[in-house]
């Protein structure tokens, strides 16, 4: 079956960066934090997490270790939301999960996407490639380069548990600073603003 998500990435790399890739496959992953036994979840994978007509589903395992991906990818990049960032697909999956397992009322689900590359140019840097696939302000990415793929050392994200909320007294922030410091303020303050937006705030308070 055609992998639409993978094809979109492959075409964008060619259109935006003139990088030709033979094939890109994708994996939609779900991380579940709850009390439901893993065996019970495994029995309902095709009811909630995968479309059995066009997708392969598995539970309690990494899809990259299954025969479906036994053809030796050259680079693997996994992208998921950072802790505390709204994960709308995860919220939708949580709603469906609670319909199937209503007793697990505190369960939460986080999503991630893994991109699997074949026929990648030898001079294409895996970390640069990851930078084109995710927004570093709100997402995190793990990379398996050629060496890691050869060793079958696959990237695995953990559940993005938000840190404990601690009240912090309001603080004054000096916005008369260089661009690098503005970007650091946006990142550490979880503002998720790009540099142009930070410039607008800086100009507003001058």
Describe the role of every protein-language-model region:
Residues 1-206:
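Core nucleic-acid recognition elements
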């Amino acid at each position: 079956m055609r992998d639409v998500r993978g094809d979109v990435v492959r075409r964008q790399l060619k259109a935006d960066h003139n990088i030709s890739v033979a094939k890109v496959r994708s994996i939609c992953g779900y991380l579940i934090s709850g009390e439901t036994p893993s065996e019970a979840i495994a029995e309902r994978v095709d009811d909630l997490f995968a479309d059995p007509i066009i997708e392969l589903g598995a539970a309690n395992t990494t899809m990259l270790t299954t025969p479906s991906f036994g053809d030796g990818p050259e680079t693997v990049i996994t992208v998921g939301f950072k802790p505390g960032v709204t994960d709308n697909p995860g919220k939708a999956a949580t709603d469906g999960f609670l319909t199937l397992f209503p007793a697990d009322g505190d369960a939460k689900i986080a999503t991630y996407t893994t991109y699997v590359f074949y026929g990648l140019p030898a001079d294409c840097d895996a970390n640069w490639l990851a930078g084109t696939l995710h927004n570093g302000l709100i997402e995190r990415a793990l990379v398996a380069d050629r060496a890691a793929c050869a060793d079958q050392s696959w990237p695995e994200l953990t559940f993005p548990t938000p840190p404990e909320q601690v009240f912090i007294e309001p603080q004054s922030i000096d916005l008369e600073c260089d661009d690098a410091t503005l970007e650091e303020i946006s990142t550490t303050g979880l503002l998720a603003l790009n540099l142009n937006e930070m410039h607008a705030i800086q100009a507003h308070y001058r």
